[in-house]
Amino acid sequence: MNILSFDTSSEKFSLAIYRKNQIIYYYSRILKKKYSKYLIPIIKDSLIKVNMKIKQINVISISVGPGSFTGIRLGIAAAKGLSMPYNISLLGFSN
């Protein structure tokens, strides 16, 4: 199972990609209020680095709080936008 997981609930953005229950890629960066500019490009670049396409992801997990209301909304919107065309399951987690 391939999982894309990310957290947009604080100034520090975190992303992990799991393959067969092992983390194969991890990325973390202070983004503050720049999520709308960098979120999708970071996800795209991360998938390229592990030689995967979004359609190979089985589950997208996203932080649902507590944290920044706007950050959480952006993360959920991105996760939903990425998941819908490929019928990828969504999973929310608390941080």
Model-inferred region functions:
Residues 59-90:
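DPxDG-like acidic metal-binding loop motif
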Residues 10, 94-95:
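Short beta->alpha linker loops
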Residues 1-64:
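N-terminal beta-alpha supersecondary unit
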Residues 50-55, 84-94:
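Phosphate-handling active-site elements
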Residues 35, 74-75, 94:
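Catalytic-loop motifs flanking and including active-site residues across diverse enzymes
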